[in-house]
Amino acid sequence: MDRYGLICRSFYENPDVTQRELASILNLSLGTVNKLLGDCLEEAFLMTDMDTGKYLLTEQGLKYLEQFKVDGAVITAAGFGSRFVPLTFETPKGLLEVFGERMIERQIKQLHEAGITDITIIVGYLKEKFEYLIDKYQVKLLYNPEYATKNNLATIYHARELFRGRNMYLLVSDNWIRNNMYHKYECGAWYSSVYMDGETSEWCLSSNKKGRITSVQVGGHDSWVMYGPAFLSRDFSNQLIPLIE
């Protein structure tokens, strides 16, 4: 993660953010945050308001953020959703409701709130059920002909041109996210995860002290597992795409 970008993004989203809040948001010590603020002042990403003493994001800071601007989002919605049987016999899993709201629509609205409107939904099973979203939210649909036999890597393969050279969210249609976690700017590739106690057949992650994923394996116990949204930076996608082509 680019720490200068995270500092600039924090002031872009909340000009009144405090150093203590920054430390909490970035999971850093106050001392590290203080040093980063000093670096951002030297680079002219921030300036100090002479009247209030507050830090202000500068034009140079906004210019620095542009490299991290999110270009769009891809939502995978092609699968049958066997875990939701019998609900998915007639309704795709992403169109199931939680608290009276369809899961995929909630994510689309959260993306819109973050200023992200270039959204493509990868469809397969009962693909016609998603067509109403085109008019309602101006999304695009892309058909994955291998949805019944292959996994999400095949989905990324069919959508690879949407990721090539772009900063993109990769979401799954059947996630319900309480708080909006999307941003106009993302300062590095990431994959969200949850901790699972006991045995699991999910994709289990190993990471170093800096939170960088070092390995992935199918199945494990008492482990962090791949679960939920991901963000693929253009640099990450440019390395990933040749591996799946």
Residue ranges and their predicted role:
Residues 1-3, 18, 51-68:
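Short, cationic-aromatic polyanion-contact patches
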Residues 128-204:
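Conserved beta-loop-beta/alpha segment of the NTase-like Rossmann-fold superfamily
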Residues 9-12, 60-127:
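N-terminal glycine-rich phosphate-binding loop and ensuing alpha1 helix
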Residues 31:
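Key DNA-contact positions within bacterial/archaeal DNA-binding proteins
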Residues 177-245:
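Conserved core of the sugar-phosphate nucleotidyltransferase
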Residues 41-51:
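A short, conserved structural fragment
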Residues 1-25:
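Short amphipathic alpha-helical interface segments
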